[in-house]
């Protein structure tokens, strides 16, 4: 039971903050998937966003990474978080196989739908661009005020 709770809400969010928790998560992904080059960029202070934003941002990034590993067959992924005065912009860009976005609208892709729903629950915006054989680019912009 403790393991399930830890997976739902890692204690490191409270103890280390969002930036260190994400860095730790990226290190885990990198060690488990050594063929995948993970590039993490954090600009601005993302550690004072509040509990609700923190857990949702953590889950968004986790799901984006999961999608890359399961579906994209990418060799690189760039995750960037940019905190400005009023927003947090998250970008996840991979060089994987990409997909036809019209298929996404016809089927229920739960991972991407979950990311979109989390962004919308925070009054944020979700955008996805994908080209077959060229990769996928997710952009999430969340208001922080």
State where each predicted segment sits.
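Coiled-coil dimerization/phosphotransfer module
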Residues: 1-145
């Amino acid at each position: 039971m403790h393991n399930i709770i830890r997976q739902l809400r890692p204690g490191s969010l409270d103890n280390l903050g969002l930036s260190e928790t994400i860095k730790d998560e990226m290190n885990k992904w990198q060690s488990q998937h050594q063929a995948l080059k993970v590039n993490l960029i954090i600009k601005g202070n993302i550690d004072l966003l509040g509990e609700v934003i923190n857990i949702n941002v953590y889950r968004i990034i986790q799901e984006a990474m999961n999608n890359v590993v399961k579906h994209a067959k990418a060799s690189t992924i760039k995750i960037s978080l940019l905190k400005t005065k009023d927003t947090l912009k998250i970008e996840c860009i991979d060089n994987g196989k990409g997909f036809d976005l019209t298929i996404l609208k016809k089927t229920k892709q739960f991972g991407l739908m979950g990311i979109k729903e989390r962004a919308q629950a925070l009054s944020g915006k979700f955008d996805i661009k994908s080209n077959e054989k060229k990769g996928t680019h997710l952009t999430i912009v969340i208001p922080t005020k």
